[in-house]
Amino acid sequence: MAVRVPLGCTGSFCPRLLPLLALLELLVDPSLGRVHHLALKDDVRHKVHLNTFGFFKDGYMVVNISSLSVNEPEGVKDKDTEIGFSLDRTKNDGFSSYLDEDVNYCILKKKSMSSVTLLILDISGSGVKVRSPPEAGKQLPEIVFSKDEKVPSRSQEPAVSSNPKDSKVQRTPDGSKAQRSTVDSKTIAEKFFSIHKNDGAVSFQFFFNISTSDQEGLYSLYFHKCPSSKLRSGEQVSFSLNIDITEKNPDSYLSAGEIPLPKLYVSMALLFFLSGTVWIHILRKRRNDVFKIHWLMAALPFTKSLSLVFHAIDYHYISSQGFPIEGWAVVYYITHLLKGALLFITIALIGTGWAFIKHILSDKDKKIFMIVIPLQVLANVAYIIIESTEEGTTEYGLWKDSLFLVDLLCCGAILFPVVWSIRHLQEASATDGKAAINLAKLKLFRHYYVLIVCYIYFTRIIAFLLKFAVPFQWKWLYQLLDETATLVFFVLTGYKFRPASDNPYLQLSQEEDDLEMESVVTTSGVMENMKKVKKVSNGAVEPQGSWEGTA
């Protein structure tokens, strides 16, 4: 466990950060990672998704159920309620067909199921029945029960069944044809193993090895509870489960599709840092045309770069030891939260034209920020909870759905300032005498609107679909597309709103300042016979002008 080092700080800013740091300390559990521990108490769900992991050859999974008990209403026997586990194998992260059934569907009652191994518990009989499909041992690994608590080695053979007449099937590591058991190879093979029972709770351990390349894939482990039909209305069967899951590939605790992520994050962090450095050089070179929003834009790539570096470090420790280091995880979550909030604030400020054409936000603009900022903080908190919570917990699904909804609302909200600016420019180009400048800025805003829509489309929709379409070992392409789209969005936004005298976005600011000054002067009787003379230097119109008398 990581040792916490007390940090000291002074000033009024640090006390404001203390509640956030305390929240992050509570959310981050150093024991979580690819070595999983899940404890459920009096749970009433029919199906619990315990974990999903992509395995290469020589990978393995060890599942240790230290306690599993069922609490049934009076009059219902143990055999009336079926409980057990299922191990599903797919080639990608798509949805399993057998899990898309209605609520009353119970996979444990199915006699034949392709690519799914079932473990059906008999608590009263202190045993578990393993129902394997015909391809078990060839395209699917065999489930091995063992009383040994040690992690199995790659060359370890499956343990012999506790039932002698079921011990005829042995796995062949060289991929040769397995021996025929008491059941035909084209039918479902069933084996029975004895398990330990104490005070109504059972405990046992099983594991499997990926011995051939044909067995590689994305494996999902589920817990199922099939209530009895004898239950009366309002009655429920609850269960308590304490389980530890260890899963590992040959050289990493990361899933097959996550192994390249540390290197990917470091590479993208370098690109974001270089883009930020180039942007700082442009700002220093064009100091006379720089606004406050340009410096806010400069902070964004550096914050993103830091977030990616800490994310890479976090994944490095998970890869090497199976769980993150608490300190690095907290630092990553802080930078991720700041990056997310800064990104949406910057996009909204550019859309409203703050610091470019106006220095005070309108009431409509303020309402947008009052909506976007809390939603973005909530989205980042949901992300942190999801990252530091096991999939099988009841709150995991709730926070995952909340993150999707809140992120969608944020993406929709930041489009409103751009739409309002486009509508305002359309009206202004038809009324005032500066139609050319307004039309140029209108074209720029339309490009920015399309840019935001494309960014949302690629990072929220295309990348999401890619994650479910590509094979399990290429799942990291989802993150590559997401980070690449973000980098392209940063570069194009900087190019569109770069500090330059020929930028229509900045020219409008200077022309409107002149227009406001003319309206003030013409309403003054003292300056009635004065006309404005603009000073021109280096081909650019300066915002301030001098006045001379005409009398």
Curated annotation (Swiss-Prot):
It is found in: Cell membrane; Golgi apparatus, trans-Golgi network membrane. Residues 153-164 have a biased composition (Polar residues). It is a multi-pass membrane protein. Widely expressed. Not detected in the duodenum, nor in the exocrine pancreas. Keywords: Cell membrane, Disulfide bond, Glycoprotein, Golgi apparatus, Membrane, Receptor, Signal, Transmembrane, Transmembrane helix. Pfam families: GOST_TM (PF06814). Residues 1-33 form the signal peptide. GO terms for biological process: clathrin-dependent endocytosis. Glycans are attached at residues 64, 209. GO terms for cellular component: clathrin-coated vesicle; early endosome; Golgi apparatus; membrane; nucleoplasm; plasma membrane. Residues 127-183 are annotated as: Disordered. The chain crosses the membrane at residues 263-283, 293-313, 337-357, 368-388, 402-422, 444-466, 476-495. InterPro entries: GOST_TM, GPR107/GPR108-like. Has been proposed to act as a receptor for neuronostatin, a peptide derived from the somatostatin/SST precursor. Involved in blood sugar regulation through the induction of glucagon in response to low glucose. This is Protein GPR107. It comes from Rattus norvegicus.
